[in-house]
Amino acid sequence: IDELLEIKVNILIVDDNSPDKTYDVVEKYFGNNEKVNILIREKKLGLGSAYRDGFKWGLDNGFEYLVEMDADFSHQVNDLKALLLEKDEKNIILGSRYVSQGKVLGWSKRRSLLSKYANNFSSFITKSKINDMTSGFRIYSKYSLEKINYQNTKNNGYAFQIEMTVLAINNGVKIIEIPITFVERESGKSKMNSRIIIEALKYLFLYRFKK
């Protein structure tokens, strides 16, 4: 949070009543900082739901650009600076692990291959030229979110990122990929599980057969 505040951004933390007492920590250290906000939800409702609520909060509060990024140190503040330099009122800026100069640090070879193949498969099914369909490091403009009708998205796992990418392309919103260095989380466990994988596969096959 301190690093983000140095680049003069407003911060929203979406907390699904987490057992690590996220709210208490944020309130203790940043309770008097008007640039740090926290949105508390009663229970765990999923990644996509958190983004939808976060986007709504941002738009309701008059922000023209909204950044989504992980809070576990996987996404780097220096990369955010690079993404912000490219922001555009009509485009989506996507932090990509799988373009030239993009990197992933700290993953096993198996996990790296699984992620790369999953992204390639997603691109193939949706006929997209985007290399990192599941990236959770993006800058959305107000225009792009309204054009996509983000509030009508259905997915809650990593399929949410694929769905948002597909909706952007189908609605004529340009996506610009910028290389980032993704670093494996410093603590905690990955949210990836079989339910999330099944949701993504279901979305992709439904999308393919509807076309």
Give the ranges of each region predicted by the language model.
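A conserved acidic beta->alpha catalytic loop
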Residues: 15-24, 73
